[in-house]
């Protein structure tokens, strides 16, 4: 008596699972950065084109494969052709790498969340130095938010060679993050199906609240105007935007953002779709999920830019206040006579009246510019943990906003983790060998335990540098290759006509020519060009470098990777990409040996 | 004669209190920045209060001769508001060493601030660093408490789910074993009714059935 495959209680759970997986931290911390870098509002044009041409078709393809084969990634590709089981294994390996380092972000989220229940927020003030006459030097050189991130949270070492010890506080947060993930995946779709209601919907609630708060902040409009018309005046910005549209890098970055934002190639989408009823309309769901994912990116960047605007305006006004104080003290002017509005004319007056004294003071007078404050484009953990926390500390009732924000980050992160772990667990639970010996709960527990143990590497003092290595190299090239092989395999090995008739029998829906053209032609070509671009970029850059934190200067410096780090990078990329040819080779050898065995008998 | 003496005294005073003089300190007030609309104007009465506060701080140091208000000299008052002051000894010929004045002011800094409704940032004594308030030292940091609470909740939830899963699978096992038993009995019955000669598990022979057969076959 075979056990029935678990299924989602209703299609809505499936859609929410896909949304909570696809809508992750990348929508919040990568898209606004790309938007700012490649022309603001005009970046939306290549982004939306790539969504329609690349995102939707590939998402539909993965969901259709999972729903048709009713198995995880390894089983699905093995059914299509036994030589392709390597593709499934490669997906599982990449998902394994991803879940190892991704949960560390959740650990950081927990850390900041727990520290938000203090007054004042710990990253808003610098700690005192040893004799209590001033502030800590590192904090003075950098800023209090950077100090809290680099020193108190990460306790970062000056270079990747100095590993340092495991930070017990961060290790505890990592253990908690993994326990939380285990709690959500413990019972398979039964528990995941309920959790995704929260992980999919709650971030939107927080984003809406933040939109309301962000738009009413002082100086938010500066940020929004900057987002749509970067580089100042409208004539200049229009030229800049048109230039960016002609730049191939803009299109490549739009394509890669769509590709990685949807989480294609990890096997998570195949895993989720395999728990669907075969009659489920996955075309509709694919379109809905990809549209919601992109809309969330745009929505999140509106919120981010209004926060940028607030932070830039606040810093600009503090800079002006410092200049005013400096001039007032140097020339003993009446307190309050210098304001932001009369600063320029007063400077000229002082320069003409007391030229010698003015020239003494002049080097210390900073040129405060709103433009330069807005121009600091930040992405990744820097945006999420430094820039945002800096903006939050200046808001009223900052504890509330801080709690809301880090809670949202946690929801986004855990939602993505559910998909990552599903990609690893579904093939394991599908396999008869493993699931007959161990119950589902034990398999999930073992996977979480192994990931947690390896993840301790990222809680060491040099952990953030290893995190950056994994973040930049573990998934990028391998995924492109995996999805390329998937598309070609489905269209040419399994046969597009055969799949089309399968889908018609399954869902009752005919496959329109649009999808056929994209699957068979356009998308593979696009992926090949992305792959070629990435390879050429790696080769041209020569030695790979990373940003290390220099405590004495209070800023990041560029350093070269040591050889063993380069070896690890090579191993990461090779271990997942090599699965594909090795899998095919392995099956070929096994079949050859079987034929050799059976031949004498016949 | 008298006014000659007076001139001499003020001249010596002027020498004692000068910007940058030995043992002189510059003070800077930002009254408008601190109090906004409630700012008071700085006049000679406020200066008198200041001199009184400095004398008070000097008197607080034990084992010293008592300082009078007249021993505190102010000069170079600007619009900012900023000025210089020195503390002289009772003979009014020498100034008290800077180190002593510094420690006296540091000890009574809070009282001086409160007298003017200002704080360390708005009433600045240049060259006298203020002791910054130490952070509130909790015995157990707040974040560990919240971490502990959430950790316990998660552990409890996991144990509940795992235990209920084990209990459910045990119940299923006993149910399926009952089902298997009753299925076995059904199979048993079927084989006996078919009259399987090989089946010697000693079931009953249905007499009524057998007798009907016997009745019919001889025909």
Predicted features and spans:
Chain A
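Membrane-interface "cap" regions at the ends of multi-pass membrane proteins
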Residues: 1-29, 58-63, 73, 86, ...
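A generic transmembrane alpha-helix motif of multi-pass inner-membrane proteins
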Residues: 456-458, 468-491, 511-602
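Transmembrane helix-boundary motif of multi-pass solute transporters/channels
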Residues: 13-49, 60, 180, 185-186, ...
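Hydrophobic alpha-helical segments and their helix-loop junctions in multi-pass secondary transporters
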Residues: 58, 102-107, 111-120, 137-140, ...
């Amino acid at each position: 008596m075979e056990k029935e495959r678990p299924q989602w209680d209703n299609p809505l759970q499936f859609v929410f699972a896909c949304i909570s997986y696809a809508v992750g931290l990348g929508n919040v911390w990568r898209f606004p950065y790309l938007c700012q870098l490649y022309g603001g509002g005009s970046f939306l044009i290549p982004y939306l084109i790539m969504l329609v041409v690349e995102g939707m078709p590939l998402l539909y393809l993965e969901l259709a494969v999972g729903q048709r084969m009713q198995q995880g990634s390894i089983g699905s590709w093995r059914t299509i052709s036994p030589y392709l089981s390597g593709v499934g294994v490669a997906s599982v390996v990449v998902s394994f790498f991803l879940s190892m380092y991704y949960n560390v972000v959740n650990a950081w989220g927990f850390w900041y969340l727990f520290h938000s229940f203090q007054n004042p927020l710990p990253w808003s003030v610098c700690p005192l130095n040893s004799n209590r006459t001033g502030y800590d030097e590192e904090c003075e050189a950098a800023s209090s938010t950077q100090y809290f991130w680099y020193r108190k949270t990460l306790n970062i070492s000056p270079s990747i060679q100095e590993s340092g010890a495991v930070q017990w506080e961060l290790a505890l947060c990592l253990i908690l993050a993994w326990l939380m993930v285990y709690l959500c995946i413990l019972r398979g779709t039964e528990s995941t199906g309920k959790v995704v209601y929260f992980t999919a919907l709650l971030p939107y609630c927080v984003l809406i609240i933040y939109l309301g708060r962000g738009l009413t902040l002082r100086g938010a409009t500066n940020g929004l105007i900057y987002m749509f018309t970067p580089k100042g005046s409208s004539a200049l910005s229009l030229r800049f935007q048109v230039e960016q549209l002609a730049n191939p890098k803009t299109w490549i970055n739009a394509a890669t953002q769509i590709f990685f934002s949807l989480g294609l190639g990890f096997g998570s989408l195949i895993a989720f779709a395999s728990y669907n009823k075969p009659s489920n309309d996955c075309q509709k769901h694919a379109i809905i999920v990809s549209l919601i994912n992109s809309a969330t990116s745009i929505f999140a960047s509106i919120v981010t830019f209004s926060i940028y605007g607030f932070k830039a305006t606040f810093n600009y006004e503090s800079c002006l206040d410092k200049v005013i104080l400096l001039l007032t003290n140097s020339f003993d002017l009446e307190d309050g006579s210098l304001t932001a509005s009369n600063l320029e004319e007063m400077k000229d007056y002082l320069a003409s009246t007391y030229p010698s004294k003015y020239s003494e003071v002049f080097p210390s007078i900073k040129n405060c510019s709103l433009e330069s404050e807005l121009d600091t484009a930040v992405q990744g953990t820097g945006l999420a943990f430094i820039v945002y926390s800096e903006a939050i500390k200046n808001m009223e009732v900052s504890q509330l906003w801080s709690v809301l924000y880090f809670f949202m980050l946690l929801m986004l992160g855990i939602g993505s983790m559910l998909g990552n772990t599903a990609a690893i667990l579904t093939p394991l639970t599908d396999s008869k060998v493993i699931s007959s010996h161990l119950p589902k709960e034990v398999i999930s527990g073992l996977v979480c335990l192994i990931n947690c143990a390896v993840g301790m590497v990222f809680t060491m003092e040099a952990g953030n540098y290893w995190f950056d290595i994994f973040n930049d190299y573990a998934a990028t090239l391998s995924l492109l290759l995996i999805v390329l092989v998937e598309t070609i395999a489905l269209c040419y090995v399994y046969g597009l006509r055969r799949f089309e008739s399968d889908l018609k029998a399954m869902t009752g829906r005919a496959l329109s020519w649009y999808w056929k053209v994209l699957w068979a032609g356009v998308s593979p070509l696009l992926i090949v060009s992305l792959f070629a671009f990435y390879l050429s970029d790696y080769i041209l850059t020569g030695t790979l470098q990373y940003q290390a934190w220099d405590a004495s200067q209070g800023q990041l410096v560029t350093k070269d990777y040591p050889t063993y780090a380069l070896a690890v990078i090579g191993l990461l990329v090779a271990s997942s990409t090599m699965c594909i040819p090795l899998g095919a080779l392995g099956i070929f050898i096994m079949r050859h040996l079987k034929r050799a065995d059976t031949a004498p008998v016949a | 004669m008298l006014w000659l003496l007076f001139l001499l005294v003020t001249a010596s005073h002027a020498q004692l209190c000068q910007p940058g003089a030995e043992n002189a300190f510059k003070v800077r007030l930002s009254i408008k920045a601190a109090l906004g609309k409630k700012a008071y104007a700085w006049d000679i009465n406020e200066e008198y209060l200041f001199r009184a506060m400095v004398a008070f701080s000097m008197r607080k140091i034990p084992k010293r001769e008592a300082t009078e208000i007249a021993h505190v000299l102010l000069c170079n008052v600007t619009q900012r508001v900023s000025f210089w002051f020195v503390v002289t000894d009772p003979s009014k010929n020498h100034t008290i060493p800077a180190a002593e004045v510094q420690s006296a002011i540091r000890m009574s800094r809070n009282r001086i601030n409160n007298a003017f409704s200002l704080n360390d940032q708005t009433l600045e004594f240049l060259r006298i660093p203020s002791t910054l308030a130490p952070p509130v030292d909790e015995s157990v940091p707040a974040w560990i408490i919240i971490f502990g609470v959430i950790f316990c909740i998660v552990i409890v939830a996991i144990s509940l789910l795992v235990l209920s899963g084990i209990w459910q699978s045990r119940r299923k096992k006993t149910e399926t074993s009952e089902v298997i038993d009753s299925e076995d009995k059904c199979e048993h019955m079927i084989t006996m009714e078919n009259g399987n000669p090989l089946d010697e598990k000693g079931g009953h022979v249905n007499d009524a059935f057998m007798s009907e057969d016997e009745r019919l076959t001889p025909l």
